[in-house]
C-alpha cells in the first residue's frame, strides 16, 4: 500500500541498502537474516538509488508501511491502525528495525575487517599502528571542530531539560556526584578494600557549593528550587572542573599514593590495563582505582597508613612496622596495609578481563588458599601457592634466643620478599616473635609492591601523554614497539623501562607486560586455541602419552597442581594444544614446568598457551626443544666457556672433582629456571627474559655460580656439588641484588654476538662427535 498524501508528507528517505530477505521479528531471532559480504561497489551502486532504506524484491513491498511513523500526526497513526490493524503494523515496524540492524551490522563488520587488514599491513612493514591512530584521532578532532571552535553550549538550560528546571537541578547534581559502587550494589554485600581517611577530610573541607548534596535531603530540594531559575550549564561545568582540579583533591591523591595499598587481594584482570589510569589536569600523580571484594571472603580489617614517599624516611617506616607487628593491634583480625574508601571521585574506565570461575583461578588471584593448611602445620603457603617450611616458632628461653628467632624470621622474608634485616636497625627489639610475623606475612610484600606499582604507573602516564594514547586505542598496555625507537629521547625512555623491569614488574601489570614483551600479544588468533583442542581426527601420538606421565608430577609442592589440583586439566590442554600446533617439536620435558609456571599468573589458559608458544618460538633460540635438543646441548658448552673465562676458580674446582656442569645446568636452561630457584626470583627472571632475551639464561647461571662460590668451593666431592646445585628452591637469595647483578655485571661479557659465535662452534663440535 502506498501511503496517502497526509501520511507520507513527513516521510523521510534514508540511506539505501541491499535487498535483504525479510523476516518477522515477532517469531524469534531465528528468522534474522544472515550476514552478507558488502563490497564498496555495492555501496556505490546502492547510493545511486533513491529508494527508501529497506527495498523489498517481492510484491510485499507494495503493501509495506513506511518506517517514519514517529513523525506523522496522531490522527494518521490512528487511521493506519484502523485500516491495517495494530498487530500488522507492529510486525511491519519490527521487521524494519530488524532489517536496519542487519544492514548496520554488516556495514560495521565490513569496515572492521578492512581496519584489521590495514593494521596487519602496518605491522608487516614495520610501522606502528599507535602513531596511525594518533594522527587519525587528531584529524578527526580537527575536522569535527573547524577553526579550533568548540561546540557551543546553550545559554538557557531549559532547552535541554524541556522547560523543567527541577530536572536540570538533578542533572547538574548527577554530573558533579562522584561515582560509588554502592549506587548499584547493596552495601551489605560488599566490603570496600581501600579506605582513605585523607579523602574524607579533603572532601569535608571543601566548600558546600563545590560538592553535590544528597538528593534525598530536604535541604537539597529547597536549595534546588531556589537555584533552578539561575543555573547555567556552562557555570556548572566550570564548577565541576574546578572541583576535580582543586588543591584539596590534589592533596587527597598525593596522600592516596603515599599510603601503601594491598595489591595481594586485587584481581589482576581488573587492574592490568594501566592505560586507563588518568589524572586531573593539575595533578601529575597517577589515579588509583578502588576495588571491592565480597564480604564473605574476608572480614573488615584494621588499616594503617605507612608512608613510603621518601625512601630515606626509615624512622617512620620502622615505627609503623612496630605498630603493625605489635600484639596490641592484632585482635585476631587479619591486618592489611591497604586503606578503604567508601566514596571517591570517578577516575575513568577500568578494563574488565575474562570472568574466570574462582575454583580455577591461580593462587596469585586468590587469598584463601591458606585455608587448605592447618594453623599448626609445619609448612606455609607463599604468594603463588608453594609449600614452604615454616620458620621455627618454639618459645625462646632467653632474650638472646628471642632476637635470634626474630632475625631468623626476617631472614625468611628477606629471601622471599627482598627486604634486608639492616633496614629495620634496632627495631628488632620491638618486634614480636616469628608466629606473629608469619600471620602478617603480606606486610613486607605490600610495601615493595606498592612502590613498584607507583613507579610503573608514572611511567605509563608519561608514555601515554607522549603518544597521546586514548581509551579507544587498542594497542595493548605498553605499545612496546615504540618505546625505544620513537622520538628524540627514545633510547633514554628504553633505559628507564629496563630499570623498571630490573626492579620488578608489579603483579597487577605483569601479565600484560609479559604478553607484549614476549610477542605473544601479536601471536594471538581468536578461535585458534579452541580449534586445536577440538581436533579429534588425529591419532594421539606419543607426545600425549608423555604429557599424561609428566603433568601429575609437575610442581608437586604447589596447591594449584600437585597431581590433583585444579591447574592439572588446564596444563594438559595447553601442552596437548601446542603439540598439535607444532607437531615437529611435539612435547619435550621442560615444557610442563614452563606451562605450569605461566598458569600461576594467567587465569586464562589461552593466554598461557600463547605465552608458551612465544617463549619456544620467539624468545628462545631456534631448535631449542627439537627431539635432538641440539641448540640446548650446545648452550651448555657455551656456558662452560663463559665460566672458564669469568669464574676460573670455580671452573678449576669443578674440573678437579670431575663435575660435569652440563648435567646440572641443562635442566636450568630447559625449564628456564622455573623449578630451580625460589618462585619470586623465577618471576623476576622472566621479567628480564622478555626484556633482554635469551642472554638472560647465561647471565643468571653465572650469577648463581658466583653467589654460591664459597659453598661450591667448600664441597669436597662431586656428589655434594650435584646435590647442592640441583635444588636451590629453598636457598635464601636476595632478589633485588641477584637480578641487578645478573642484568648488569655480565652485560659486556655475555652478549648475543658472543653467544652466537660460541654456539656455532659448539654445534659444529657436536655434529662431528655424532658423525664419529
Swiss-Prot record:
Keywords annotated in UniProt: Phosphoprotein
Positions with biased composition (Low complexity): 275-291
Region (Disordered): 143-163, 275-294
GO biological process terms on file: vesicle-mediated transport
Residue intervals of the Rab-GAP TBC domain: 504-693
Molecular function GO terms recorded: GTPase activator activity
Gene3D superfamilies: putative rabgap domain of human tbc1 domain family member 14 like domains, Ypt/Rab-GAP domain of gyp1p, domain 3
Recorded coiled-coil stretches: none
Entry protein name: TBC domain-containing protein C4G8.04
Originating species: Schizosaccharomyces pombe (strain 972 / ATCC 24843) (Fission yeast)
Amino acid at each position: 500500500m502506498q501511503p496517502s498524501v497526509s501520511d507520507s508528507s513527513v516521510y523521510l528517505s534514508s540511506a539505501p541498502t541491499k535487498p535483504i530477505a525479510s523476516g518477522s521479528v515477532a517469531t524469534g531471532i531465528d528468522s534474522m537474516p544472515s550476514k552478507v559480504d558488502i563490497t564498496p561497489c555495492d555501496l556505490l551502486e546502492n547510493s545511486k538509488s533513491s529508494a527508501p532504506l529497506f527495498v523489498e524484491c517481492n510484491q510485499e513491498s507494495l503493501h509495506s508501511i513506511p518506517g517514519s511513523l514517529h513523525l506523522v500526526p496522531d490522527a494518521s497513526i490512528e487511521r493506519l491502525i484502523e485500516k491495517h490493524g495494530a498487530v500488522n503494523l507492529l510486525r511491519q515496524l519490527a521487521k524494519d528495525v530488524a532489517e536496519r540492524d542487519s544492514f548496520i551490522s554488516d556495514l560495521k563488520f565490513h569496515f572492521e575487517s578492512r581496519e584489521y587488514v590495514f593494521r596487519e599491513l602496518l605491522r608487516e612493514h614495520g610501522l606502528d599502528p599507535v602513531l596511525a591512530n594518533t594522527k587519525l584521532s587528531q584529524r578527526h578532532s580537527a575536522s569535527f571542530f573547524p577553526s579550533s571552535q568548540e561546540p557551543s553550549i546553550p545559554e538557557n538550560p531549559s532547552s535541554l531539560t524541556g522547560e523543567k528546571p527541577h530536572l536540570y537541578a538533578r542533572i547538574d547534581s548527577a554530573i558533579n556526584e562522584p561515582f560509588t559502587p554502592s549506587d548499584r550494589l547493596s552495601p551489605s554485600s560488599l566490603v570496600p578494600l581501600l579506605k582513605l581517611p585523607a579523602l574524607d577530610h579533603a572532601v569535608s573541607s571543601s566548600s558546600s557549593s563545590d560538592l553535590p548534596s544528597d538528593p534525598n535531603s530536604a535541604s537539597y530540594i529547597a536549595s534546588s528550587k531556589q537555584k533552578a531559575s539561575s543555573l547555567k550549564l556552562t557555570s556548572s561545568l566550570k564548577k565541576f572542573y574546578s572541583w576535580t582540579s582543586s588543591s584539596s583533591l590534589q592533596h587527597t591523591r598525593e596522600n592516596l599514593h603515599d599510603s601503601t595499598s594491598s595489591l595481594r587481594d586485587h584481581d589482576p584482570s581488573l587492574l592490568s590495563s594501566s592505560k586507563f589510569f588518568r589524572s586531573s589536569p593539575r595533578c601529575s600523580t597517577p589515579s588509583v582505582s578502588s576495588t571491592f571484594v565480597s564480604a564473605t571472603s574476608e572480614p573488615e580489617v584494621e588499616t594503617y597508613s605507612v608512608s613510603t614517599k621518601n625512601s630515606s624516611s626509615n624512622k617512620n617506616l620502622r615505627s609503623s612496622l612496630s605498630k603493625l607487628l605489635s600484639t596490641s593491634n592484632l585482635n585476631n583480625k587479619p591486618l592489611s596495609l591497604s586503606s578503604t574508601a567508601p566514596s571517591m571521585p570517578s577516575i575513568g574506565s577500568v578494563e574488565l578481563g575474562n570472568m574466570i570461575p574462582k575454583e580455577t583461578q591461580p593462587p596469585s588471584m586468590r587469598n584463601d588458599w591458606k585455608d587448605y593448611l592447618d594453623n599448626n602445620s609445619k609448612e606455609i603457603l607463599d604468594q603463588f601457592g608453594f609449600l614452604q617450611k615454616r620458620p621455627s616458632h618454639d618459645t625462646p628461653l632467653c632474650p638472646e634466643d628471642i632476637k635470634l628467632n626474630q632475625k631468623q624470621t626476617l631472614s625468611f622474608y628477606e629471601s622471599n620478599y627482598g627486604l634486608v634485616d639492616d633496614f629495620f636497625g634496632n627495631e628488632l627489639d620491638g618486634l614480636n616473635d616469628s608466629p606473629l610475623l608469619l600471620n602478617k606475612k603480606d606486610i613486607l610484600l605490600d610495601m615493595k609492591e606498592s612502590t613498584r606499582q607507583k613507579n610503573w604507573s608514572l611511567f605509563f602516564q608519561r608514555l601515554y601523554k607522549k603518544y597521546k594514547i586514548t581509551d579507544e586505542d587498542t594497542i595493548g598496555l605498553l605499545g612496546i614497539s615504540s618505546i625505544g625507537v620513537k622520538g628524540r629521547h627514545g633510547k633514554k625512555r628504553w633505559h628507564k623501562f629496563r630499570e623498571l623491569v630490573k626492579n620488578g614488574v608489579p603483579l597487577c601489570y605483569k601479565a600484560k607486560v609479559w604478553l607484549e614483551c614476549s610477542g605473544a600479544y601479536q601471536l594471538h588468533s581468536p578461535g585458534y586455541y579452541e580449534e586445536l583442542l577440538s581436533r579429534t581426527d588425529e591419532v594421539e601420538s606419543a607426545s600425549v602419552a608423555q604429557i599424561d606421565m609428566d603433568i601429575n608430577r609437575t610442581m608437586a609442592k604447589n596447591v594449584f597442581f600437585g597431581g590433583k589440583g585444579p591447574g592439572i586439566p588446564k596444563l594438559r590442554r595447553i601442552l596437548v594444544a601446542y603439540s598439535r600446533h607444532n607437531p615437529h617439536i611435539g612435547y619435550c620435558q621442560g615444557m610442563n614446568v614452563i606451562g605450569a609456571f605461566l598458569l600461576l599468573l594467567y587465569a586464562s589458559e589461552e593466554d598461557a598457551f600463547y605465552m608458551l608458544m612465544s617463549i619456544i618460538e620467539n624468545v628462545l633460540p631456534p631448535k631449542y626443544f627439537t627431539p635432538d635438543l641440539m641448540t640446548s646441548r650446545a648452550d651448555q658448552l657455551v656456558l662452560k666457556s663463559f665460566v672458564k673465562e669469568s669464574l676460573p676458580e670455580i671452573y678449576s674446582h669443578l674440573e678437579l672433582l670431575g663435575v660435569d656442569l652440563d648435567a646440572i645446568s641443562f635442566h636450568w636452561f630447559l625449564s628456564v629456571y622455573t623449578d630451580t630457584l625460589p618462585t619470586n626470583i623465577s618471576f623476576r627472571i622472566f621479567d628480564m627474559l622478555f626484556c633482554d632475551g635469551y642472554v638472560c639464561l647465561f647471565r643468571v647461571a653465572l650469577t648463581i655460580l658466583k653467589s654460591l662460590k664459597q659453598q661450591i668451593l667448600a664441597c669436597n666431592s662431586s656428589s655434594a656439588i650435584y646435590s647442592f646445585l640441583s635444588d636451590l628452591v629453598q636457598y635464601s637469595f636476595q632478589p633485588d641484588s641477584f637480578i641487578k647483578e645478573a642484568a648488569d655485571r655480565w652485560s659486556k661479557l655475555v652478549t648475543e654476538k658472543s653467544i652466537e659465535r660460541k654456539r656455532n662452534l659448539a654445534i659444529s663440535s657436536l655434529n662431528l662427535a655424532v658423525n664419529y
